Amino acid sequence: MSTQIKREKPIKKQFQKKKFADLAVQGTNNSSIASKRSVELTYLPKLGVGSNAEKLQPGKPYFRYFVPKKIKRSPCINRGYWLRLHAVRSHIESILDSCQENITIINLGCGYDPLPFEMLDPQNPQYSRYSNRLNFIDIDYPDLLNIKSGVIKETPELLSIIGGIDPTETNMIISERYKTIPCDLYDMPAFEALLKSENLGHPNTIKIFIAEVSLAYMKHEKADDIIASCSKFPNSHFIMLEQIIPVGEYEPFSGRMLKHFSKNESPLQTVTKYQTIESQIERFRRYNFTNVNAGDMFQLWNSLSSNVHSKIENIEPFDELEEFHLFCHHYMICHATNNEQFKFNESIKFREPEVLPSLPISGLRIDSIDKIGFSKRFGSSVISKDSIIYTGGASPYRSDEADVINLEECTIETLSNMKLPDARVCHSYDSLMDGKLDILIGGRKAPHQPFNDVFIFEKQTASWEKVATLDYPIYRHATSSLSNDKLLLFGGNFCLKEPFLTITVKSETQIVVRSINCPDSIKSSIGAAMCYNEASNDVIILGGSSNGTEVSDKLIIMSYDDKSETLTVKKEVTNDLFKRYGSKIIHLTDDEYLVVGGTSPDRLFDASNSIITYNSRSDEIKSVRIPDHIWQGDELMLVGFELQKLNGKIIIFGGGATCYGFGSVNNSIYSIEK
């Protein structure tokens, strides 16, 4: 074998490997564009993006030309991709509205994005006032642009928008205001030559470079070279939407996201270098985009008006706020420019994330219990002797089963005589009358199918009895036993004028439901945590949302008077670590409380603050640190879980989440003790 052939083999292998990786990255475009098509079908007929969103106006459909098939994604994916569309388009509009100059928009890794046709279409009232000063350059892999160009050439509606095209170009589209230019972004000399050939150096022409999850698949050095090259042109803006991992690769959603892209042979390479918003801001400043505004996607969500939020809530039923929090904290939108005089639109000018102080460590420790394959979430449970009875929940489909979990024997048994009246999630299930009967309240099927029923399960006869129908449906409410025959219920519906109820059991077939007095400042919430401390006669509530977007950052301690059935606020404490949706709270001593899990609109929780203790006497908050072998190895996702005291230990079981389109995480079982 000659030396020449020996050299050619590794070169050929390297070329084939790169070609395969390029195809995998191109494949991500197919998934993304299909999800945007779902948004176009579900959202845009009722609510557009960019300026149309705040005007509550619909958007015109353009994705249909590239994805004619009707596609339906989950509500959380739809909401996430609507927000992605809004992120890029609202930031472009903020630049367009700030100037009168001609603008060239260069889409790096454009895929099948129809953005040029949206903005150049004279029949699109959202952008028609800009169209005579806009030019577009779509850049992507040659194979992908060949397909896109073919669709454009075969679609009269698209051709009519961009006008006549150069018939001599077979692999490109060249028209007066729109071009497709194939380029491998890894080939820096070719990329720089491309930019130079487009005469982008004129200072009176504004350049907008867009990278919507396109540079993320490149080695960070190569992606940095792209950013640096773009910054050399005067009056340039760079809009980037990209993944981040704010608390590191071991956070469960982060880990699942990274594994998903690696499994699909399109690993996220820049995110391991630029994990946080702060590092992304520093990145752009280092490469001469010195004027930078960046935030995560929930900050963008919060910039929308309450009218837009209400409109979105009415588009499709939605009860996936935890998943939406997690998704939004893993994507950032960054607008950077080398124009120091540019003023960012105040409505989308993000504040830099607040850094929380480190916490002292509590004396509690977390251990994992032998895995016994329990994978349900959003159910409800009671303690029965030395076992746990878990009802309903989903895995992934809603269940009507009751399971007995025996931790000593590491067994799970489904009780055939205890099947629930209906499959449900987000209900409450409590034991009263010395364990002789259990009470099931509310919950839901789908988000638009909530329950308002109350059932009692009489253990001696193993039968369910419907004992009441509430005036309104409730789910994601919180309950605590006040006495042997009385239950306190909080929230479960945004519209309640009286957020607390007591439910008193009179017999196996009769209950009395009463609203109780509480201060007007206490609003009904869903997803709040509550516990009752019998020794101090205190009711504690924490977090929750009263409107589906905002989450309370308060822990409120109230004294309960049984005779007058009145709650009186004793203490109200505000802290960012109390801003949780879907958390649980349990009292450890008269003064100390354990707060576990949930999600926040402001941040991702990590190994040091996912679980905390609060002392009501000293107001001290301590960390119940999740040990490395659990945090790094188990994907502990404190969403949709249950929390119970059993044999002197606190038990965390059930729970997990669907991590957007990246797969699901299910928890093992854990104990907390001194």
Swiss-Prot record:
One MF term in the entry's GO annotations: tRNA methyltransferase activity
The protein's annotated pathway: tRNA modification; wybutosine-tRNA(Phe) biosynthesis
Keywords: Methyltransferase, S-adenosyl-L-methionine, Transferase, tRNA processing
Functional summary from the UniProt entry: Probable S-adenosyl-L-methionine-dependent methyltransferase that acts as a component of the wybutosine biosynthesis pathway. Wybutosine is a hyper modified guanosine with a tricyclic base found at the 3'-position adjacent to the anticodon of eukaryotic phenylalanine tRNA. May methylate the carboxyl group of leucine residues to form alpha-leucine ester residues.
InterPro entries per UniProt: Gal_Oxase/kelch_b-propeller, Kelch-typ_b-propeller, Ppm1/Ppm2/Tcmp, SAM-dependent_MTases_sf
GO BP terms: tRNA methylation; wybutosine biosynthetic process
Enzyme class label: transferase
The EC number(s) this enzyme carries: 2.1.1.290, 2.3.1.231
Pfam families: Kelch_4 (PF13418), LCM (PF04072)
UniProt record similarity statement: Belongs to the methyltransferase superfamily. LCMT family.
SUPFAM superfamilies according to UniProt: Galactose oxidase, central domain, S-adenosyl-L-methionine-dependent methyltransferases
Lineage top rank: taxon: Eukaryota
Reaction(s) catalysed by this chain's protein: 7-[(3S)-3-amino-3-carboxypropyl]wyosine(37) in tRNA(Phe) + S-adenosyl-L-methionine = 7-[(3S)-(3-amino-3-methoxycarbonyl)propyl]wyosine(37) in tRNA(Phe) + S-adenosyl-L-homocysteine; 7-[(3S)-(3-amino-3-methoxycarbonyl)propyl]wyosine(37) in tRNA(Phe) + S-adenosyl-L-methionine + CO2 = wybutosine(37) in tRNA(Phe) + S-adenosyl-L-homocysteine + 2 H(+)
Protein name: tRNA wybutosine-synthesizing protein 4
Residues bound to S-adenosyl-L-methionine: 84, 109, 140, 184-185, 212
